[in-house]
């Protein structure tokens, strides 16, 4: 039986992190968690990490698409925080962001890790950005590192 699975270490991986500035009090902690994870667990060098800042979560897919189209990166981490308010705006922003990022991954055959918090309250967002519920930016980075490795391993298996 052949089993294809990745590991976390990706010393030579080139990673783009597309970051929403909206709700920056939460998103900056997600970014810190992602970068720390890439460096400590993935052994990714500083020069192989590029941070791209965009206004909000709706802009994440377009920036991710441009990054993917460049062919210069092994994967993309998208970070943001969409916090529910009193209008249906939350549903549109969260849904379109998720759908757009998934489309980029499929269109360019490139791992795109979804590190966009979608929470009902500010407290939930803070908990998920490095306090009670861990750091979802770091978790997104772990997922990306594994997928970069899985796809490389799968490519080798399919060529044999």
UniProtKB/Swiss-Prot annotation:
Record keywords, A-Z: Riboflavin biosynthesis, Transferase
**GO MF terms, alphabetically ordered:** 6,7-dimethyl-8-ribityllumazine synthase activity
E.C. number, please? 2.5.1.78
Report one GO cellular component.
Answer: cytosol
Q: What is this protein for, i.e. what is its function?
A: Catalyzes the formation of 6,7-dimethyl-8-ribityllumazine by condensation of 5-amino-6-(D-ribitylamino)uracil with 3,4-dihydroxy-2-butanone 4-phosphate. This is the penultimate step in the biosynthesis of riboflavin.
Q: Name one GO biological process term.
A: riboflavin biosynthetic process
InterPro entries under this entry?
A: LS, LS/RS, LS/RS_sf
Q: Where does (2S)-2-hydroxy-3-oxobutyl phosphate bind?
A: 86-87, 128
PANTHER family from the entry?
6,7-DIMETHYL-8-RIBITYLLUMAZINE SYNTHASE, 6,7-DIMETHYL-8-RIBITYLLUMAZINE SYNTHASE DMRL SYNTHASE LUMAZINE SYNTHASE
Identify the species of origin: Shewanella woodyi (strain ATCC 51908 / MS32)
Q: Which Gene3D superfamilies match?
A: Lumazine/riboflavin synthase
- Span-the-membrane segments of this chain are none
Q: What is annotated as the active site? A: 89 (proton donor)
Q: Summarize subunit and interaction data from the UniProt record for this chain.
A: Forms an icosahedral capsid composed of 60 subunits, arranged as a dodecamer of pentamers.
Name the protein family.
Belongs to the DMRL synthase family.
Q: In which pathway does it act?
A: Cofactor biosynthesis; riboflavin biosynthesis; riboflavin from 2-hydroxy-3-oxobutyl phosphate and 5-amino-6-(D-ribitylamino)uracil: step 1/2
Q: Which reaction does it catalyse?
A: (2S)-2-hydroxy-3-oxobutyl phosphate + 5-amino-6-(D-ribitylamino)uracil = 6,7-dimethyl-8-(1-D-ribityl)lumazine + phosphate + 2 H2O + H(+)
Q: State where 5-amino-6-(D-ribitylamino)uracil binds.
A: 22, 57-59, 81-83, 114
User: Mind telling me what this protein is named?
Assistant: 6,7-dimethyl-8-ribityllumazine synthase
């Amino acid at each position: 039986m052949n089993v294809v699975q990745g590991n976390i270490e990706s010393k030579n991986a080139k990673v783009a992190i597309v970051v929403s500035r909206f709700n920056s009090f939460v998103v900056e902690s997600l970014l810190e968690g992602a970068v720390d994870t890439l460096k400590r667990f993935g052994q990714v060098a500083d020069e192989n990490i590029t941070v791209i800042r965009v206004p909000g979560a709706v802009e994440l897919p377009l920036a991710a698409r441009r990054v993917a189209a460049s062919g210069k990166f092994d994967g993309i981490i998208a970070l943001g925080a969409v916090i529910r308010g009193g209008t249906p705006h939350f549903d549109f922003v969260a849904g379109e962001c998720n759908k757009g990022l998934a489309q980029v991954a499929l269109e360019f055959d490139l791992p795109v890790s979804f590190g966009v918090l979608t929470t009902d309250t500010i407290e939930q967002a803070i908990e998920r950005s490095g306090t009670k519920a861990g750091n979802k930016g770091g978790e997104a980075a772990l997922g990306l590192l594994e997928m970069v490795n899985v796809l490389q391993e799968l490519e080798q298996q399919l060529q044999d």
